[in-house]
């Protein structure tokens, strides 16, 4: 961005609470930096397809609505995460499956392209050992996952194709039922997994890929726990006891997940009502097109967003609500079964933690709550690496 334009746009941001670096004590910041911090659900890859959005450039949440980029990963001490191949659910027809498969492959290629363009600062991780090696090298860690396995159609051999492309985690379903499973936000069709969905579980285990139960119905969750030979995860979910929404999990199932060795990675959505109005969607569409706007259009967008924020914020959830959710999960499941999966760039973020720069606040708060640095390190990344190793060790024994 040229300097005159930067100066022109900087003024509105000087008054923003996001302009200053999050206030965390030097000691807490150092502890956070020394940990391996991984988020299991980064939807920023939705911006990669066109090639016009530069992941290496410093962006601002207030400007384009984005929450993750390489500079902010450094600022927030986020060492890596799962970059998501997301496909919105469509029809269960051969033509729709083909279109979805193409879209998913394009997204996978875009993620690999971005990793390659920034190979001096980040690398593709296929295993837990890869993640630890990249961390030692001072590089950011890029895992790849699939949110919604609808693009597989009825051909489960495509799971191996995506595995070869680097995918190491996948969920069967998203916001609507598909050929594999019932969604938690749809009317039951299969009463859990479909027959093909049960085969999907076996193939995921065979390949050593993590099974992600987020967005799955309660019945699907129960069947995933029953059928999987290794622990499953919820890549971006939360406790229903904190906010009663179908996307969240009840305490009994949280305990069952922990007994099975699984991990719930804590979401920042479904903590409180948020703004899903047409006006908010329109602002979001304009923000996603930030790179193409001229200075006058950018000023107008910032003014319109400020007016809408003053009328109703993008979310009523706060950082304290998020921490209450995480602390409840720890109390129910234990520190070995909780992690971080905030759904950045997929609707995530709360007041006081609007983007990844604020992640050190979590470590600071956990220390204030009396958790040891060892336990915090489990939550920040250790628990993820454990379940990855378990899934891949099972696959290796079966090969």
Model feature map: region roles:
Residues 37-44, 216, 234-237:
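Histidine-centered catalytic micro-motifs
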Residues 218-219, 239-241, 270-273:
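Short, catalytically relevant binding-site loops at active-site mouths
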Residues 7-17:
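Bacterial N-terminal signal peptides
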Residues 20-191, 244-399:
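N-terminal hydrophobic targeting/anchoring segments and the immediately downstream early-domain regions
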Residues 202-223, 251-259:
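Substrate-binding cleft of carbohydrate-active enzyme catalytic domains
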Residues 190-205, 224-234:
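Alpha-helix-loop-beta-strand connector modules within alpha/beta enzyme cores
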Residues 1-7:
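Bacterial N-terminal signal peptides that target proteins for export
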Residues 155-159, 182, 220-230:
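Distinct, well-ordered alpha-helical segments
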């Amino acid at each position: 961005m040229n300097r005159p334009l930067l100066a022109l746009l900087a003024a509105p941001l000087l008054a923003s609470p996001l302009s200053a670096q999050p206030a965390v004590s030097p000691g807490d910041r150092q502890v956070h930096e020394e940990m391996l911090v991984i988020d299991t659900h980064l939807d920023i890859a939705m911006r990669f397809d066109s090639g016009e959005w530069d992941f290496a450039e410093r962006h601002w949440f207030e400007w384009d609505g984005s929450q993750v980029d390489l500079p902010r990963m450094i600022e927030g001490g986020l060492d890596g995460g799962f970059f998501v191949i997301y496909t919105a659910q469509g029809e269960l027809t051969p033509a729709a499956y083909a279109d979805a498969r193409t879209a998913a492959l394009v997204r996978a290629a875009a993620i690999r392209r971005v990793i390659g363009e920034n190979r001096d600062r980040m690398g593709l991780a296929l295993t837990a050992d890869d993640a630890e090696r990249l961390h030692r090298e001072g590089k950011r860690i890029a895992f790849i996952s699939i949110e919604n396995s609808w693009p597989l159609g009825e051909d489960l051999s495509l799971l191996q194709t995506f595995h070869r492309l680097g995918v190491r985690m996948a969920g069967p379903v998203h916001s609507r039922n598909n050929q594999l499973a019932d969604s938690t936000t749809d009317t039951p069709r299969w009463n859990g997994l479909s027959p093909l969905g049960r085969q999907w579980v076996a193939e995921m285990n065979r390949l050593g890929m993590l099974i992600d139960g987020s967005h799955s119905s309660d019945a699907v969750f129960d069947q995933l726990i029953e059928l999987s030979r290794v622990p499953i995860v919820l890549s971006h979910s939360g406790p229903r006891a904190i906010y009663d929404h179908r996307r969240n999990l009840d305490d009994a199932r949280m305990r069952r997940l922990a007994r099975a060795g699984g991990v719930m990675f804590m979401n920042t959505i479904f903590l409180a009502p948020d703004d899903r109005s047409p006006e908010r969607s329109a602002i979001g569409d304009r923000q996603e097109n930030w790179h193409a706007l001229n200075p006058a259009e950018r000023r107008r967008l910032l003014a319109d967003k400020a007016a809408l924020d003053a009328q109703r914020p993008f979310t009523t959830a706060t950082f304290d609500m998020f921490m209450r959710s995480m602390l409840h999960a720890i109390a129910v499941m234990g520190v070995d079964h909780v992690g971080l999966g905030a759904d950045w760039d997929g609707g995530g973020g709360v007041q006081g933690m609007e983007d990844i720069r604020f992640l050190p606040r979590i470590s600071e708060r956990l220390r204030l709550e009396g958790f040891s640095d060892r336990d915090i390190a489990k939550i920040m990344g250790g628990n993820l690496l454990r379940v990855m190793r378990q899934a891949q060790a099972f696959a290796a024994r079966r090969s």
